[in-house]
């Protein structure tokens, strides 16, 4: 959504990322991707193309990938208001946690768009198991390697360059410890 509205900032304008994010969050037709304000922003600060070949994410939840009420850090203005992937994205992949029970970590399931290659796949584990933030079990495995290997394979099969060590070092184990 952010790239569809604001484009991909040119390197000298990278410092404007917060301004771009604020623009993206504003309601109204002028701030929509084809609105006049968005067009002017992209023309001034961004590369001409907004095309994105592949988006791969792990367990997007709540508001823009973070829980809305987690420790009271977020408010309604940060809620994710559009669960459709932008028309500028060709391929979208989403690894989701099937064993998460906390309401703050409920996945934001994307709504499909016509003519888009989209896959959303459930993996064993809670939110942090999917993205990988826990130490390995005694057998040196973690649940996050399951979703990592899937995402690496998806990206590679769509002609993205993948660092070889990601596949070589992954040790997928669907029976690794669930931390919830």
Regions found by a protein language model. Name each.
Residues 1-180:
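Active-site- or binding-pocket-proximal scaffold segments within functional domains
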């Amino acid at each position: 959504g952010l790239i569809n509205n604001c484009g991909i900032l040119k390197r000298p304008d990278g410092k404007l990322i917060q301004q771009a994010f604020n623009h993206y969050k504003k309601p109204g037709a002028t701030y929509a991707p084809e609105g006049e304000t968005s067009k002017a922003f992209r023309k001034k600060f961004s590369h001409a193309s907004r095309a994105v070949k592949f988006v791969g994410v792990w367990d997007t939840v709540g508001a823009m990938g973070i829980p809305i009420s987690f420790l009271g850090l977020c408010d309604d203005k940060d809620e994710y208001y559009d669960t459709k992937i932008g028309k500028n994205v060709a391929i979208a992949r989403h690894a989701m946690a099937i064993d998460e029970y906390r309401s703050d970590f409920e996945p934001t399931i994307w709504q499909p768009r016509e003519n888009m290659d989209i896959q959303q796949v459930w993996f064993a584990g809670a939110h942090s198991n999917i993205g990988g933030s826990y130490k390995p079990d005694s057998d040196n495995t973690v649940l996050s390697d399951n979703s990592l290997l899937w995402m690496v394979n998806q990206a590679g099969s769509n002609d993205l360059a993948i660092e070889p060590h990601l596949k070589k070092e992954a040790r997928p184990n669907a029976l690794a410890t669930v931390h919830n």
